[in-house]
């Protein structure tokens, strides 16, 4: 049967599928657009499962903050071309909004949740794989919330608002002025993106990393042939420098070299006359 061009256009608008696929679907379904939609979905999902095994090395980081809670996630694609695709970007923004709503960091649980279209998150991703033509992989999710305070974030060099290749969210617990807290949290998020700390504080720094670094420094100092007491002081000094490199609260603030992050927070406490606790952060970098 001859397929009307307007029907092909309508089906394309509804599904995002190519002209040839739309024409084939309408021909197979006697011109019925609703049946053709289902046909495309069935055919597309079958193809999508084949594509879902392909390697992904690009993608986007997205953030969504809303008052006292926020989320950040990484969605990977095969190429930067797809990462710049408007449909892919819309999917990623919708996913991070839902991640903030559902407040789960479990990929397995999140994929089972309902997407805004009424399907599951998993099925929506598979549908987008079919339409876009590349594998799409939800790599990780990070969520933060506070009972009283703010969550804010930062994306470096965004492709559009809240989307880029590297980003961070920060949670501050305080009864202080929320607008001023948001400014502080964003400044800290910007610092995190630049300085890339390994941990919030020394007590939560990975012990294996800590022991490995101390062992490396000890071997270096042993070659100096210093007395034991002197050698120990040198080791402690170098470890202090290591902490300043990797522990957020000990890092020198990138916007003011006269302050550490801990001192920055204390200064803001004095200004607001309220206690401020930096309770957590999430830093995501594409494929890191």
From Swiss-Prot:
Molecular function terms, GO-annotated? translation elongation factor activity
Asked if Cytoplasm is a keyword of the record, the answer is yes
Cited InterPro entries: EF-Ts_dimer_sf, Transl_elong_EFTs/EF1B, Transl_elong_EFTs/EF1B_dimer, Transl_elong_Ts_CS, UBA-like_sf
Of the GO CC terms on this record, one is: cytoplasm
Query: What keywords is this UniProt entry annotated with?
Result: Cytoplasm, Elongation factor, Protein biosynthesis
Entry superkingdom: Bacteria
Localization terms from the record: Cytoplasm
Q: Which parts of this chain are annotated as the region Involved in Mg(2+) ion dislocation from EF-Tu?
A: 79-82
Q: Does the keyword Protein biosynthesis apply?
A: yes
Q: Which family does it belong to?
A: Belongs to the EF-Ts family.
Function, as annotated, reads: Associates with the EF-Tu.GDP complex and induces the exchange of GDP to GTP. It remains bound to the aminoacyl-tRNA.EF-Tu.GTP complex up to the GTP hydrolysis stage on the ribosome.
Identify the HAMAP family for this entry: EF_Ts
Q: Which NCBIfam families match?
A: tsf
| The name this protein goes by in its record | Elongation factor Ts
Q: What is the lineage of its organism?
A: Bacteria, Pseudomonadati, Pseudomonadota, Alphaproteobacteria, Rickettsiales
């Amino acid at each position: 049967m001859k397929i009307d061009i307007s029907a092909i256009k309508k089906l394309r608008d509804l599904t995002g599928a190519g002209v040839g696929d739309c024409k084939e679907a309408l021909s197979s379904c006697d011109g019925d657009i609703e049946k053709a939609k289902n046909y495309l979905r069935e055919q597309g999902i079958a193809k999508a499962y084949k594509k879902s095994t392909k390697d992904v090395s690009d993608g986007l980081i997205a953030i969504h903050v809303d008052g006292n809670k926020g989320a950040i996630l990484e969605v990977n694609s095969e190429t930067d071309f797809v990462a710049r695709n408007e449909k892919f970007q819309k999917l990623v923004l919708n996913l991070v909004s839902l991640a903030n709503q559902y407040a789960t960091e479990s990929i397995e649980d999140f994929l089972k949740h309902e997407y805004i279209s009424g399907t599951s998150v998993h099925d929506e991703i598979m549908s987008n794989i079919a339409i876009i033509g590349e594998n799409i992989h939800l790599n990780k999710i990070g969520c933060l919330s506070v009972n009283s305070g703010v969550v804010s974030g930062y994306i470096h060099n965004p492709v559009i608002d809240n989307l880029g290749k590297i980003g961070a969210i920060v949670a501050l617990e305080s009864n202080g002025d929320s607008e001023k807290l948001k400014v502080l949290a964003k400044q800290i998020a910007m610092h995190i993106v630049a300085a890339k700390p390994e941990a919030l504080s020394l007590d939560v720094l990975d012990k294996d990393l800590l022991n490995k670094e101390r062992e490396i420094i000890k071997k270096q100092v042993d070659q100096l042939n210093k007395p034991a007491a002197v050698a120990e002081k040198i080791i402690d000094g170098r470890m202090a420098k290591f902490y300043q490199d990797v522990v957020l609260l000990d890092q020198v603030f990138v916007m003011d070299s006269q302050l550490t992050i801990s001192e920055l927070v204390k200064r803001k406490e004095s200004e607001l006359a309220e206690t401020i606790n930096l309770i957590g952060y999430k830093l995501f970098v594409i494929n890191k």
